[in-house]
């Protein structure tokens, strides 16, 4: 099994409201769209969302929902890479939203600054 498969039963889908933390409707829609895509297809999917809409939370949530064995995230810059690595290694946004319990252990995260050129390196 994988971290995301093992942790999936603890994943929740709270909807944000005025008085309660949760995932925003656009985030829930994107998570469900990603899951629906992979029910019938095995080719890559693309999630497009505006800046500030919570793409990183969707990215991490999708790994849980899809029970991913391994996740490769390619970032366009060092700053974005560092932000995403921090978010994945703490699961802070999903915990704040109530999608995961505060005591949920985080996955192992490895960042690389160079190209991975062999299966062994992967």
Task: Please name every model-derived segment.
Residues 1-122:
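N-terminal helicase ATP-binding lobe
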């Amino acid at each position: 099994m994988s971290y995301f498969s093992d942790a999936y039963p603890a994943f929740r889908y709270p909807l944000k409201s005025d008085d309660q933390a949760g995932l925003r409707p656009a985030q829930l829609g994107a998570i469900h769209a990603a899951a629906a895509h992979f029910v019938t297809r095995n080719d890559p999917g693309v999630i497009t969302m505006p800046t500030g809409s919570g793409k990183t939370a969707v990215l991490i949530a999708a790994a849980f929902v899809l029970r991913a064995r391994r996740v490769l995230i390619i970032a366009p810059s060092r700053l974005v890479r560092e932000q995403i690595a921090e978010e994945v290694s703490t699961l802070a946004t999903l915990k704040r939203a109530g999608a995961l319990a505060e005591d949920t252990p985080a996955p192992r995260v490895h960042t690389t600054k160079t190209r991975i050129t062999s299966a062994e390196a992967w």
